[in-house]
Amino acid sequence: QTGRTPISAPPTGGESARTRPNYVPNTQQQASLERLASFYQPNDQQLPTTEVTRPSDSADASSTVTNTTSDSADGVTQNLTPTVINTTTPAITNAPMCRGTWVYPSSSFHAADAQAAAKTDRPNSSFPLYAEADYGYYDNDTYAELSGNVQVNQGRQQIAADKVVVNLQDGVAAAQGNVLLVDTGQSGATPVTSRSDIRNVEGGIITVADEVAYQTDSSKATARDVAFASVPLQAHGYAKQLNKISESQYQIDEVMFTTCDPVNPTWKINAKNIDIDTDTGRGEARGATLKVKNTPILYLPYFNFPIDDRRTSGFLIPRFGFSTDGGVNLQTPYYFNLAPNYDATLTPSVFSNRNPMLTGEFRYLTRDYGAGNITGSYLPSDRQYNDEDRSSLFYQHRWQSKDIPTLSAEAVYQYVSDSAYFNDFDTMDSLNTLGNQLNLPRRIQANYYNDYLTALAKFETFQTLSSDLTGNQEVLDKDKPYYRLPQLSLHYKLPWIEKFDITGVSDFAYFKRPIDDGSALEQSAGRMFNKITAAYPINRAWGYVTPAVSLQHLYTQYDQETVLDNNYSKDNKSKSIFVPEYSLDMGLNFFKAGSPSDKHFTGGYQLISPRLKYVYAPYEDQTDVPNFNTRLASLNFPQLYENSWFLGYDRIPDNNHLTPSVNYRYIDGVGLTRLDASIGQRIYLEDSRVVLDANQQPINSGRSATVMQLSSQPRQDFWVDLDGAVNSDGSLNYYNGQFRYQPTNTSLYNLGFVKRRANEFGQKDLSAITASAIFPIRNGWSFLGTVQYDNDRSRFSDALAGVTYESCCYGLSIYGRSYYNELDSTDKPTRAIMAEISLNGISNRRSGRLSGLMSDRVLGYNQLQSF
């Protein structure tokens, strides 16, 4: 085969590299594997503080390992307790289930030169060459020989052997007897401190063989019957022949490769040949067979895989699963590394109960104009959806100014063919972040902020989906949200007035809702809202007092088309309202040093803060003012101190109320807030009269429910968040809570609940429970589960449970999921069973669908370590 010949034939014989593959290690390879095990640092063995020299003969080499069994999976040792462990790699924190870590041997001299070489991209041949041996001969013309404990160092490369012979005319050298060839690669300036860090090293290989030929004036080398280990990839194997043809390229023939422990590896790849390029970060295997426990599982004529964390073109790990609607499905994504600043992924999906589907994603990054991504999918004539075509499109672009870092912009476009799309297809992560939304926003907006101004300019429209909740009919145009074409919002603070805080809000928008179905007459208008507030804060250690006065103005004007269509008079064409507002906010601080219970906590301080706020604003009739996008806020503790229950600028509330509350906090000696509890209530001195719509009743209950909230961290691994409200008659208004317990870095438990009664804020009854658990079982197996239970419907709205197995070299996930489409009122859930397999070194453990689902649903999941 062209381009795969060695640079020079080794000094002694050996069969051709093109003979029939033989993947069982021969005697020479067996000996090389045993010696290679000397550089596998067991987890429970500390790194040596003094250097031990390399064995000088095969007898010593064999003594470095014990209990060798020739019938093990690859003839590797069963007991790794080497006496020869030389390492320049710092102590490495190993992934769980790994018995050890591949480490570089140390150099007995010129270590500073080797470290400097690893941090530069200079050719290795440009560094000086150093050598030492027990005996040397040099004829000053054509021949040089070193023998007896030979060590040769040049830049990033080390060679140790019993004998080295050099042809001075062509620069070809031959190393014989217990040969060790080490290339530490380029690691940059960042030291290796963890098992994940070593993947940042480009290149890096340990080679053990009985004889090696190499060129002294280049990076070329050839070894036969060789065992090798990649420190950056934490992989090892053996080969009939290994050729290093440049600084970054390796050609390996008749090879076994695995990232598992060297003792009975769970999986391995046997290949006719493998090409590795550390410049591109990829490997190419031809005639490859994946074996699990020596059983052939998959044959691949060609396989492209990563050797580090850089992105390059190639197949990603396929996904396989089963669902009640789609049946068996298989997704085989292919990644295109088109350029450093843009790439693409194309994913064909095959379903047993549907037609094939094609999904594509394109990502790009520009120098001055931001970054974005486009994701689209198409499935023709879906057999599970009345033979209708199914499709989706998502586009997002983000930009941030380099000259003005606080200036940014974003563009978003979303489209799906039907409301069931999210329920049926969960392969498009960009769209999945939106959830089951009835109205999908499409917008262009720009943002700017500084110390005194926050500004937003936005154009926004929506795609409104049909839903069973609307009778499975198209939503009437009159019930769709208004477009904002455009909206400009300013929040500002005037800086030049001492002692006074002058702040303001200005919001300008044109609202349009096209009516094409005749469901109502179109009512489009411009709206302008302004509010300016002058406050005089008095802050002292004992507390604070803040009087404030505001002037609010709301102006709306219908456009000419709306005026003509609705026959509005001149008086009804526009509406202008001015409303003043007065408030007084005050609070006290009572400090006490020490903890509330010396038995459980020490040090720190306690703080009790009573607070009282009064707000007054007169009533102005707003019956004829349209409501474009304003709604009522939910009842909770922070909302008690807002001056308005309205979220939006279509209403200016009338206020005459008083809000008392008290807060207690304990901060311990190390700065953790162990307890933060508050209780408060709003007292209406006068019934409010401004409402959102004519059919809504005003809030006139005399006083609000008593609202409470509590956050606590009683232990380092336990968190509690509670809040709720009780009506004046003692009945429940609402309560919800969240408990999180994380006893270890690999286990997590969550329990959440919410209960709410229908109230004057337009909120409906709600009762639900959420729970999740992640914990290791044993021997690498872990359980993952999360449920959402709807008490009102007496059903699990979303349930997921599965097991994962993660070892040093592969991961397996099997899980099932049952869930309802929230836009579908039927009682038929979608059920799916999925399986995912990842092989370390050629895939990412946390890139699977299961990790994405758990990350979206489980608080604290992303902080867990791999099991």
Model regions: which residues?
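N-terminal amphipathic/hydrophobic interface segments
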Residues: 3-253, 268-271, 276-287, 346, ...
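Outer-membrane beta-barrel proteins and related beta-barrel translocases across Gram-negative bacteria
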Residues: 29, 35, 104, 180, ...
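Accessible peptide chain termini
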Residues: 1-3, 532
